[in-house]
Amino acid sequence: MKQFRRVMLFLLDSVGIGALPDAEKYGDAGTATIQHTLEGNPGLTLPNLERLGLMKIPGMEKFATGAKPQGVYGKCRELSKGKDSIVGHWEVMGVPTRMAFDTFPEGFPQKIIDAFTKMIGRGILGNEVASGTEIIARLGEEHQKTGFPIVYTSADSVFQIAAHEETVPLATLYQWCQMTREMLDNMGFGVGRVIARPFVGTPGNYVRTANRHDYAACPPEQTDLEILTESGIQIHSIGKPVDIFPEAKFTSTVKTSDNFIGMGEALKAVREKEGLVFINLLDFDMKWGHRRNVAAYGAGLKAFDDYLPLFQDAMDDNTLLVITADHGCDPTHTGSDHTREHIPVLLWHRGITPGAAGIRETFGDVGATILKALGAPSPKVGNSIL
């Protein structure tokens, strides 16, 4: 395998490709994010992803048009327990989660709420499992009258704090979240993420803003990102990776508010950066998957597909393109939570020999491939696909 100057890793957040064998345990039997999105959007085609091999991946054959693959293609099983962003990202970077994070299907225990309210000096609203947009619509007006933050969770391991930007300044909300991260760690609760969920607007017209910020738990072991750094190889974050890996020493970070900004920043980075450029495109998950918007999810896939030729044209001979995901969020499934699925993996560089990578045993094969491509030592978990 040749060495590359840079690897461009696009992680399409929640773009799963079919239920894992144990999906039924998670209430996700039969889920298939990409497949059901295509079925729910008659006439939708993804010709550029198909050229990379997407429709040759097991489970995608019915959508094939006969285009000859030009890349390496496959899908990965998950070793970790769980189905959220932390678990998926960590395993992609070589650290499967052996113990599931704590979840709170009945809301947070009183001792957590008591500690939180004492810490911030005021009460709370909520403390329930809820959709973010729904609970803001329901409790937003009371929040603005009282100044009490809205605290809620989901099926994932998250402690979410919502506040109106004119009622609780962003700096205060972020401080609360950082303090909560430390509080939960000190209390011995394994919570994957504390998330600031700011919103604006008036009663009946509240909308969440792009000022979300995640405060993630630190991985229990060294990730592939540290291996790259210790090898003298740069790592760059576009979007969410810097929030998911708080211990990583990113050479540069760029915040993004939507997929289009992320894709634009990636186009600049492929011309300017070296090492690993890690791009998370979050709209698939946050704006369309959780909201079960099949049409918008399809439009998002189409927008990325349309972008691919422009991006590939900007790649030189020393650049490897990797496309993958972290979990599913099937927009046709019941509820609003993530779905436990395989993730796709598509690889392309100039001169690549096309072929099938099969069904891989761990998401960690993605990270292992990146390490090998950049000339770094092999990880403990994962085997290179190339």
Predicted regions and their residues:
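Feature captures the catalytic ectodomains and active-site-proximal regions of enzymes
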Residues: 1-386
